[in-house]
From Swiss-Prot:
Organism: Coccidioides immitis (strain RS) (Valley fever fungus)
Family affiliation: Belongs to the FMP52 family.
Single GO cellular component term: mitochondrial outer membrane
Keyword rRNA-binding: no
Protein name as it appears in the record: Protein FMP52, mitochondrial
UniProt keyword annotation of Transmembrane present: no
Record-linked PANTHER family: OXIDOREDUCTASE HTATIP2
Primary location group: mitochondrion
GO biological process: import into nucleus
Length: 246
């Protein structure tokens, strides 16, 4: 069974990843690093049902400072999940957003590798590109490049579109696009919504499924060192390959 760690586990996708990991018989341990403990009733119930499986490190210090805990955690995480992200409005500036999203992600990824992590799973964004003129897409692309430079045994990058689902911290733009995406799917075909909007639970299922497959060496296309999932790949894994995540 796999040992895991996650940062960003209180967010929309991250909280669903935590729930899936807690429910999975293929996962032995979850190290949860966050500013606050899980707060959803579903997660709390799952933790109560699997108390020996879950360990939390709660700190209000900057996430980059959590690296020392990660290096010494036991058991060492074989799979590391990162959904760590924020908005410029929440961070206060583009520089502050970069410090959290890029610098903290890279510092924690480096610490995970030093601790013995074999598989790194990053939830990024559609359009991520280090050469993009759009600050957000460039930021996401820079994160991906820096993670790839760390040269994990296996790296999985998911690039979902706008995320739909119930989040604690409502983001206005994502909410509007999610409504439009849902309407498009209802009025036309489900694949139309899937083209630009991804359900957070499906992204979480795809993340866990791909991570476990990479650790086992059962990826569909063989032993892939880097696997990038977007659009239909996320939908396929999230909807039809649940066995890997359960």
């Amino acid at each position: 069974m796999a040992t895991t760690a996650i940062v960003g586990g209180t967010g929309l996708v991250g909280s669903n990843i935590v729930n899936i990991l807690l429910s999975s018989p293929n996962v032995a341990h979850i190290d949860f690093l966050a500013r606050r403990p899980p707060s959803t009733p579903v997660t709390k119930d799952l933790i109560e049902s699997h108390p020996s499986k879950f360990a939390s490190y709660i700190s209000t210090d900057p996430p980059s400072s959590w690296a020392s805990h990660l290096r010494s955690t036991s058991p060492a995480p074989e799979i590391f999940f990162s959904t760590l992200a924020t908005t410029r409005a929440t961070a206060g500036s583009l520089a502050a957003q970069r410090a959290l999203e890029h610098d903290a992600n890279v510092d924690l990824a480096r610490a995970a590798k030093e601790a013995g992590t074999k598989v790194y799973v990053l939830v990024s964004s559609a359009g991520a590109d280090p050469s993009s003129k759009l600050p957000y897409m460039k930021l996401k692309g820079d994160i991906e490049k820096s993670i790839l430079d760390l040269n994990f045994e296996k790296t999985i990058i998911l690039r979902p579109g706008f995320l739909s689902g119930q989040r604690e911290e409502r983001r206005i733009i994502e909410g509007m696009v999610g409504v439009i995406g849902n309407a498009a799917g209802w009025l036309s075909k489900p694949w139309l919504k899937d083209w630009w909007s991804n359900d957070a639970v499906e992204v979480a299922r795809a993340s866990v499924s791909a991570g476990l497959a990479a650790l086992k060496g059962t990826e569909p296309d063989g032993q892939q060192k880097v696997r990038i999932l977007a659009g239909k790949d996320i939908v396929r894994l999230g909807r039809t390959e649940r066995k890997e995540a359960s």
